[in-house]
């Protein structure tokens, strides 16, 4: 099993190209199920979760071509199977996103209840509630969601909670429904907006994009299109935190600064000098970062997927910071590992109190989920001595060539078996 070996060695300096967004690419690839035509996607990150999605779609009978790196062509002219099996869904929660488009276009779908991260229950009840409101018959049998509908019909659906996956599934399903669907309390995340823009490129009629009220007029069919996946705001944020922690100067290319203003604001609060253009971000940190308080909330507030990384910055910051996690339970699994490296973090319920220390010490640590593993990598960049991060298969789900990208800006980091 691969590990990362890191030796702390001072500031990061240089340019990093940000990859396409995993959390946008996954639903956008599933949107290919909505048309018999060929979809061509660019800026697709080469990640474990993308490979899993490719396997899932191919298993259903979709033709997937990946002739060029970061490009993918999908043709779902017919499906051999309307089932998404447990063997694949258990490894990645986003597999549930085939439910809406498959049901809408083919009249039935069977999808295993999801697995994926160990950071909380993340139920799919809002997905099911919405599909039932649109006329589907839905049952849960032997761990599978089974849905049928001759043709979905438009409905007004009020989400009980903000759910990114639920919004995406219902948005895709509504594009082929009869009549108008209104999604109230819809997620506003940039990745949802990216999916909506892709659907519009395919011929969908959607208004309110970027707001919490999406109005979708169903059409009889969608057509093929070419679409570029948006840059990954979480990968970008991770590299910016690494730059700030190491007191370096990093410039991110192919970035989307407007999608991550809450993160940039917090980094400015730590003392970082940040400049942005349309597709680039520059961070320069001259001194020890200042500790910051922050709370995770749905977009446009601070994202839960950046919680572990900014908490890690607090570990070596001047002062103390209070971190409150409101999105997922059980999302402090990186805390014991950071404390093993010399951090001073106390957890009370969904709040962590982080007191900055002068230095961290290298240690062997274990990744528990995708973003926790990223936090341990950036902790290793500033720790004295050698850090070994184990179980980095979590990291490979969401970061493309992280050791190469960090190595190119001065980090001493390598993948070892």
Swiss-Prot record:
Broad enzyme group: transferase
Residues holding UDP-N-acetyl-alpha-D-glucosamine: 93, 122-126, 305, 327
Positions carrying 2-(S-cysteinyl)pyruvic acid O-phosphothioketal: 117
Pfam family, one: EPSP_synthase
Gene3D superfamilies listed in its UniProt record: Enolpyruvate transferase domain (3.65.10.10)
UniProt-annotated catalytic positions: 117
SUPFAM superfamilies: EPT/RTPC-like
Membrane-spanning ranges: none
Stated role: Cell wall formation. Adds enolpyruvyl to UDP-N-acetylglucosamine.
Family of the protein in this entry: Belongs to the EPSP synthase family. MurA subfamily.
Protein name (Swiss-Prot/TrEMBL): UDP-N-acetylglucosamine 1-carboxyvinyltransferase
Organism of derivation: Chromobacterium violaceum (strain ATCC 12472 / DSM 30191 / JCM 1249 / CCUG 213 / NBRC 12614 / NCIMB 9131 / NCTC 9757 / MK)
């Amino acid at each position: 099993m691969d590990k990362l070996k890191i030796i702390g060695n001072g500031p990061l300096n240089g340019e990093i190209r940000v990859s396409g967004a995993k959390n946008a690419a996954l639903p956008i690839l599933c949107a290919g199920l909505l048309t018999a035509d060929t979809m061509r996607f660019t800026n697709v990150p080469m990640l474990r979760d993308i490979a899993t999605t490719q396997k899932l779609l191919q298993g259903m009978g979709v033709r997937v071509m990946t002739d060029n790196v970061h490009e993918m062509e999908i043709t779902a002219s017919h499906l051999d199977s309307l089932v998404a099996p447990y063997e694949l869904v258990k490894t990645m929660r986003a597999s549930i996103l085939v439910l809406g488009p498959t049901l809408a276009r083919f009249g039935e779908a069977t999808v295993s209840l999801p697995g994926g991260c160990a950071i909380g229950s993340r139920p799919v009840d809002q997905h099911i509630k919405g599909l039932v409101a649109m006329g589907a018959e839905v049952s849960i049998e032997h761990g599978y969601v089974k849905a049928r509908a001759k043709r979905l019909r438009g409905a007004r659906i009020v989400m009980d909670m903000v759910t990114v996956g639920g919004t995406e599934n219902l948005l895709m399903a509504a594009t082929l429904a009869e009549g108008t669907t209104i999604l109230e309390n819809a997620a506003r995340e940039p990745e949802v907006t990216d999916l909506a823009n892709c659907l519009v490129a395919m011929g969908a009629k959607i208004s309110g994009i970027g707001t919490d009220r999406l109005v979708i007029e169903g059409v009889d069919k969608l057509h093929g299109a070419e679409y570029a996946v948006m840059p990954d705001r979480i990968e970008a944020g991770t590299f910016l935190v690494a730059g700030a922690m190491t007191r370096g100067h990093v410039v991110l290319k192919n970035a989307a600064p407007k999608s991550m203003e809450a993160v940039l604001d917090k980094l400015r609060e730590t003392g970082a000098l940040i400049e942005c253009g349309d597709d680039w971000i520059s961070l320069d940190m001259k001194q020890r970062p200042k500790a910051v308080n922050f709370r995770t909330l749905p977009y446009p507030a601070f994202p839960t997927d950046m919680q572990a990384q900014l908490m890690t910055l607090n570990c070596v910051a001047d002062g103390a910071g209070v971190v409150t996690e409101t999105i997922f339970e059980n999302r402090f699994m990186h805390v014991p590992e950071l404390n093993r490296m010399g951090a001073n973090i106390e957890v009370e319920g969904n709040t962590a109190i982080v007191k900055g220390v002068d230095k961290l010490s290298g240690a062997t640590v274990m990744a528990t989920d995708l973003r926790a593993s990223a936090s341990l990598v950036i902790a290793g960049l500033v720790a004295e001595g050698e850090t070994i991060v184990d179980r980095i298969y979590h990291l490979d789900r969401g970061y493309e060539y992280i050791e190469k990208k960090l190595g190119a800006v001065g980090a001493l980091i390598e993948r070892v078996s």
